[in-house]
Amino acid sequence: VGAGTANTEFECITAMNLDFFGPGEYPYKTVLQKKTCESIAFNLKDLGYRTHAIHNNEATFYDRYKVFPRLGFDTFTPIEYMYHVEKNPTGWCKDQILTEEIEKALDSSVGQDFIYTISVQGHGKYPSFSYYCEQIGEMDLFISQLITMLNQRKEPSVLVLYGDHLP
C-alpha cells in the first residue's frame, strides 16, 4: 500500500492485474510510454462520454501527461493549470481545488463525462497524529463540497472514491 499510486491507478483504470507483469513493473514508466492500453476511459468514449483526468500534482509525476492520452483521456488538468492552489504544511496541494476543476471539466462538454481525479493532500509522511487527523478533516470537507456541487447539477452523477495510502 502506498509508494505505487500509479500502479493502483493502472489496475483501476484498465482492470489488469499487475501480478501478470514483471516484479517492480510500473506500466506508466514502461509499456505506456509508447503504447495505448484498453481502459475504462476508452470504453466510455465508445459510449459517447468525454473523458477527463485531473491531478493536483505535477504533470510529469509518473509521466501522467504522456500516459493519460494513451489510456483514452481527452483532457488532463495537472496542478500547473490550476489557480488559487493552497498547500498543506508538508507541501502537498490541498484537495479543495479539485471541486472547481471537476466542475470546469463538467462544464466543458455537452453530454456525459467520465472524470478521473487523483488527489494528493492525504500523502504522508505525517509529522504527528494530530496533523493526520487535520488532513483527514480537510479531505472530508472537500468530499462534502464535491457531493454538494454534484447534487446541484441537473445531470445524474456516480461518485467513486478509493485510496491506496494507509496512515
Summary of predicted features, one role per range:
Residues 1-167:
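Solvent-exposed soluble domains appended to multi-pass membrane proteins
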